[in-house]
């Protein structure tokens, strides 16, 4: 009987179900906060994340692009919009209506089907490319749908060379009066590198060194305002063949204008970054945007650009893995980055010992999402491939949700430790009681059925309640959990062995005193005292450092403890007592049963007052 009792006492039978329930409840709470957990293990991993690599567009920013500025080399226009109309207002230089009109005319045929303006029950909706959509929408508001349709007829499309992330540009070829007009748009610096002339108010001018510098300054100036920059160029060709490659078409361009498109930061992102920084989490922005644009947005949201590095993709391409790892700690922004760069960035951070969360939405982001400790896909604009490669999907595509998910991950990890520690102490107390009684040659104080009842039934409600604790106020003031952190450390194990020994000693003392009143009375009182001891353990396990009266209220605590007591009353005061070999207890026996929980609370209060860490 003793051997069976020891075997039952040593195994916390309810632990797997409780741990799974806590993780599932945590995943449910995260889903309510727009973070959908695809893999349950990610819930626990989140608490140790110490670097977030995040996209800019749609995650840091709203993803709502609006054309704000059109800049030629010698003139600039601001786009002003109110509730009823949109207007183009000259801001500096010498306005040239002819150049502006030409630019507006070629935008609709060039955009083509890559962006569309549709009417949905009275609402104007943009579909397709958000960047081209922002430009097309401005033209739509300025000129109207009829004008746009007329321009498309005026510039019929012969061929389109679609945008790709390697060329960073798109070109369309149109036939007009027997000649071919090539319209190219994309990254201004790349388009400038393919241009030999620039459009001015006096016509086309060859780009010399001074002109080149002036155009570079113009691009950087718009980027420094936080605008996403969009370059437009063109060229005329007397002959064209459908077999021409993009390289044959996209050269000797006439640089036309730089367009500034604003995509403002989301509300709450700056505050979320402050919280992340306070929590010891490094935030790195990874974007395909121009360096000046990325830097400006980074400053707006509070990233420490002045004391960190902003690295462009072309600089990254020149670095070896060792060189990247040496500077990765200092990087705040990666600009002009590609999905391949994302993968290298994740590898570099992991090589430095970081736990990395990486966001992504495209098919090509999948390798980086898989490589990251936590892959975070976008729920709104993300592809199915990205979602499948991720552990978490953001239902609102919002950066702030990542920080909230990390907070929830920390809470869940802390709450996962509490029932484990609780059950460990309970079971060690049971083992100490059975083993001590055997050493002292006393009759076995707890039968295997009693121990099973405690482990499988009455322990479950209090342990689950511990897993539902509210976050401690300073949860995001602590550094991330080290990767080497363990649920049970040597110090904790020693403490819980000591706590189990105290429980065992107190129960044996009580048992010895009551044996003279009869074996059934002594066993029933010890059995009940063990269940009530859970009250003391639950109260002490709510926090490793704070007294239970200093913690936020847990609305599930009293119901959980009440369920455990009610279940114990059932096996004492109903016919089930014959199954469990229990007898009625009077008020004195119930009072004696309180000795163990009081001892537990006093010992733990002393430890916390002396600030002895586990």
Each language-model region and where it sits:
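A C-terminal functional module that forms or caps the active site or interfaces directly
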Residues: 541
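Generic alpha-helical transmembrane segments
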Residues: 458, 502-504, 524-538
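Alpha-helical transmembrane segments of multi-pass integral membrane proteins
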Residues: 494-508
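The cytoplasmic-loop to transmembrane-helix boundary for the fourth helix
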Residues: 480-496
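Conserved cytosolic headpiece of P-type ATPases
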Residues: 1-479, 487-488, 501, 512, ...
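Transmembrane alpha-helix entry/boundary detector in multi-pass membrane proteins
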Residues: 519-523
